[in-house]
């Protein structure tokens, strides 16, 4: 049932975050919902391993973005992966989150250093689907709420409305319009209506998907990131040092790259 996201033995036994998708009959809307407590624990464990600590307000923004990209991904085809970069002016920072439906993974990071204020807030979405060209769209948005930013992205880029609601402390619901959606109903929903939605509307469970916190970054992937620069300017990359230390741009994990190993990788390509 909609009112309990953890009401099955399967949800307790299988690893990873469970996201349930429902079709709202008669309204033509797709609803995805999950409790993100488990994913947030994995995020904090990852930060602890890195020795990183963000301001609580910044953490909340990234947690919102992680919830948003996961619920969005669960509403998209299985063959699709998505990455969002969200530039905020106040506080001045960049959020990066990504979800891969094929692998069932979610990752994210926030950046506060060397972030320039260019006078606008920007939401950049990169979408990759199997056997199709990647697609990028960028929209400007107002305000400092991540969920509202995604809603503005939907209106401007997806050309359809979508709504986020907080059902519990770490329990979020996402509703997106489908063809012939009852737009007046969708746009008129509020928090009180969401609490009784399973009693007032006919919800049909479509599927469940599972997501886990995982980047998949490896030293070989870091080689691929650095290969072009290594070919063009190895001295500028390493200087006189035999070792380069870098952070994964997706999750912040630290990698140590030796010049010898990178040279071998580049020469083998």
Where are the predicted features?
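Cys/His-clustered metal-coordination modules, chiefly Zn-binding fingers
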Residues: 178-269
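Interaction interfaces in information-processing and related assembly proteins
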Residues: 2-206
């Amino acid at each position: 049932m909609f009112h309990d996201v953890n009401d099955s033995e399967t949800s307790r036994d299988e690893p990873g975050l469970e996201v349930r998708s429902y079709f709202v009959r008669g309204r033509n809307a797709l609803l995805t919902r999950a409790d993100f407590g488990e994913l947030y624990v994995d995020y904090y464990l990852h930060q602890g391993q890195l020795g990183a600590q963000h301001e609580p307000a910044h953490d909340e923004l990234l947690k919102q973005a992680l919830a948003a990209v996961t619920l969005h991904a669960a509403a998209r085809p299985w063959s699709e992966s998505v990455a969002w970069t969200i530039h905020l002016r106040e506080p001045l920072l960049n959020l990066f989150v990504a979800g891969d439906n094929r692998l069932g993974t979610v990752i994210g990071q926030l950046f506060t250093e060397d972030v320039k204020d260019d006078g606008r807030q920007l939401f950049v979405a990169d979408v990759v689907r199997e056997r199709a060209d990647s697609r990028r769209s960028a929209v400007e948005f107002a305000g400092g709420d991540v969920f509202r930013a995604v809603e503005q992205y939907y209106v401007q880029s997806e050309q359809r409305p979508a709504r986020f609601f907080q059902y519990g402390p770490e329990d979020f619901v996402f509703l997106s319009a489908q063809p012939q959606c009852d737009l007046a109903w969708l746009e008129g929903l509020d928090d009180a209506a969401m609490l009784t939605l399973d009693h007032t509307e006919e919800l049909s469970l479509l599927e469940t998907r599972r997501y886990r916190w995982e980047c998949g970054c490896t030293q070989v992937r870091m080689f691929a990131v650095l290969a072009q620069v290594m070919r063009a300017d190895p001295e500028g990359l390493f200087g006189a040092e035999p070792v380069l230390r870098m952070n994964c741009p997706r999750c912040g994990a630290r990698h140590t790259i030796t010049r010898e190993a990178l040279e071998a990788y580049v020469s083998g390509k």
